[in-house]
Amino acid sequence: MAKKVEALIKLQVNAGMANPSPPVGPALGQHGVNIMEFCKAFNARTESIEKGAPVPVVISVYGDRSFTFDMKTPPAAYLLLKAAGVKSGSGRPNTEKVGTVTRAQLEEIVETKRADLTASDLEAAVRTIAGSARAMGLSVED
């Protein structure tokens, strides 16, 4: 019989940098999960990802205090800022542009995030990511 899921914990942890300090420790500790076991497993699975990239993770905690976790792709905002070479988005995106991304960069981001996007085809996914870029104050070039 399958184990019963007691809790779902959603966190955003930097790749290769999980440690027992907040936010990881308190979130897992209140559910009785072995924090160091999670940190070691997470850091091992994120070795192939650029160190320090934020990785959303969903942790399923079971009744016997065991756990499994699913990693998502880094947020579109992080990938867009990295592609544009800027530190943060604009405080006033409609009037103040902070950087530029090309269509080729958008397509590269779409390929990275393909598993997490709900768009039916490549063009729709590119439009979705382009909308995120514009909302952050990045201009989009064709």
Curated annotation (Swiss-Prot):
Processing and modification events after translation: One or more lysine residues are methylated.
Keywords from the UniProt entry: Methylation, Ribonucleoprotein, Ribosomal protein, RNA-binding, rRNA-binding
Record's GO cellular component terms: cytosolic large ribosomal subunit
Gene Ontology biological-process entries: translation
UniProt key word Ribonucleoprotein: yes
Pfam families listed in its UniProt record: Ribosomal_L11 (PF00298), Ribosomal_L11_N (PF03946)
InterPro entries: Ribosomal_uL11, Ribosomal_uL11_bac-typ, Ribosomal_uL11_C, Ribosomal_uL11_C_sf, Ribosomal_uL11_N, Ribosomal_uL11_N_sf
Gene3D superfamilies to which the protein is assigned, alphabetical: Ribosomal protein L11, C-terminal domain, Ribosomal protein L11/L12, N-terminal domain
GO MF terms, alphabetically ordered: large ribosomal subunit rRNA binding; structural constituent of ribosome
Subunit structure: Part of the ribosomal stalk of the 50S ribosomal subunit. Interacts with L10 and the large rRNA to form the base of the stalk. L10 forms an elongated spine to which L12 dimers bind in a sequential fashion forming a multimeric L10(L12)X complex.
NCBIfam families per UniProt: L11_bact
Family, as annotated: Belongs to the universal ribosomal protein uL11 family.
Name the UniProt record assigns to this protein: Large ribosomal subunit protein uL11
